[in-house]
Amino acid sequence: VPARDIYYYLTLSTIPIMILWVSVIIAQAGGNPFSALRDANVAEVRGIRTAAFFVLFWMVSYIMELQVVSRENIRRVIVLFIANFFYAFVSMGKMNFMILFLATAIILTERKIIRIWHLIIAFFVLLVFFVGVQKMRGSYTNPRHFTALYLTTSLANLDQNVEPSTAELPAENSCRLFYAIKSSLDGGETPVVDPILEFQWVKIGDLKYYSNTYTTVYPFYKDFGLIGVVGFAFMLGLIFGYLFKTAEDGSQFSLVLYAILAGTVVMQFIGDTFFMVLSQNLQYLFAALLPYIISKYNLFANTFARNG
């Protein structure tokens, strides 16, 4: 299938670029190299930002190969898994590990290759990874503290520190993408909300935590109050309901996109990872849709036939 080949060889050709970037960042890191890698994932460090557009194709390529995993393509699957794991590691981003874990679990469950007890074991392994990533970044190292921070503080943080309908600009959180586009066009004059939210103290019983998670309703609640929460919840329900239904009906495109975006559903108790990073999700949409356009219209078929 030409589309799968194109994505696979695109991945192979861009892995050396990522390795070079990571080598430069680590070589020039003044302190904690893992912290420097994290900084390079969310903003440029000496002109380098590891959150490159091409890594989206790595994930889509991995899922497409995993959908048809067999003895014939198992090497590809392993190479692509290692590539995506490598990126998740060097990005020092827990969400990237989550996407890789969930995408793998969803596809293998759909293929009836793994069972529930496999998922339970994998979940605890993922939790260990999360604690390890947090420790390497120089943040919280206590597993109990880490678990409590992410499982208990979000709702309390929303209740204690966020007032409804208090956004400085209309829909600046829910429609962040439009402000980002406007900012890029006017030379940065339009302010854009940082998707990494502000840390604030949260009191739970006699304990206090320093947290920047507010559950998935934060952008809608802050922009529009309870009406926004209801409206955007309905919108998300339609989107994910459609993807799930069409994936169940056999749409491979919907299955790929659902596998990638499933983290949005799982992470709702922590924060919104759909609308506030809509630009990235639209790029995933493009990367997931392109192979099926290539296959449907036999794009590049003549090129592969000549080279074959």
Say what each PLM segment does.
Residues 94-102, 117-120, 231-232, 278:
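Hydrophobic alpha-helical membrane segments of integral membrane proteins
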Residues 209-308:
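Hydrophobic alpha-helical segments
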Residues 36-44, 129-241:
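Small-residue-enriched transmembrane helix-hairpin modules in multi-pass membrane proteins
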Residues 1-114, 127-141, 305:
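Membrane-embedded catalytic interface detector for glycan/lipid assembly enzymes
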Residues 118-120, 136-139, 250-253:
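Juxtamembrane/interface motifs at transmembrane-helix termini
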Residues 76-86, 119-127, 237, 255-264:
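Central hydrophobic cores of alpha-helical transmembrane segments
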Residues 104, 123-126, 142-148, 255-260, ...:
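Short alpha-helical linear motifs
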Residues 6-13, 50-54, 76, 119-123, ...:
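Alpha-helical transmembrane segments
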